[in-house]
Curated annotation (Swiss-Prot):
Keywords: Ribonucleoprotein, Ribosomal protein, RNA-binding, rRNA-binding. One of its GO terms (molecular function) is rRNA binding. HAMAP family: Ribosomal_uL23_A. This is Large ribosomal subunit protein uL23. The keyword Protein biosynthesis does not apply. It holds the Pfam family Ribosomal_L23eN. SUPFAM superfamilies: Ribosomal proteins S24e, L23 and L15e. The gene is RPL25. PROSITE patterns: RIBOSOMAL_L23. GO terms for biological process: translation. InterPro entries: Nucleotide-bd_a/b_plait_sf, Ribosomal_uL23-like, Ribosomal_uL23/eL15/eS24_sf, Ribosomal_uL23_CS, Ribosomal_uL23_N. GO terms for cellular component: ribonucleoprotein complex; ribosome.
């Protein structure tokens, strides 16, 4: 009788399958979060751009021209500050770098404002080592 019970047990196992019943996980949240999976670093076969673009805003495009109004001259004489009309797209870091590159001076700070006519003005304060009046003479706007 033993072999038949073994056979019936085997038959039941085949009918049931080997997977058995899986306990269902109770969801307590309405949102389903994907598990964090391995994300490998990219190693492209070729660059997206064949040739990088040339510098769109070099020093000569950043600083357009010095401003020579009376108030600007007062800033040059009293405040050790140079006043320039600059590109609308230039930021303070680019203005500082351009002044340093073009006029070989150290810049203490840069203040900018966009004028009502749509141009940008920059007040470039120089360090105590440099005299704004001498630099303005060297540039040629005094």
């Amino acid at each position: 009788m033993a072999p038949s019970t073994k056979a019936t047990a085997a038959k039941k196992a085949v009918v049931k399958g080997t997977n058995g019943k899986k306990a269902l996980k109770v969801r307590t949240s309405a949102s389903f979060r994907l598990p964090k999976t391995l994300k490998l670093a990219r190693s492209p076969k070729y660059a997206t751009k064949a040739v990088p673009h040339y510098n769109r805003l070099d020093s000569y495009k950043v600083i357009e021209q010095p401003i020579t109004s009376e108030t600007a001259m007062k800033k040059v004489e009293d405040g050790n500050t140079l006043v320039f009309k600059v590109s609308l797209k230039a930021n303070k870091y680019q203005i500082k770098k351009a002044v340093k590159e073009l006029y070989e001076v150290d810049v203490l700070s840069v203040n900018t404002l966009v004028r009502p006519n749509g141009t940008k003005k920059a007040y470039v304060r120089l360090t105590a080592d440099f005299d704004a009046l001498d630099i303005a003479n060297r540039i040629g706007y005094i």
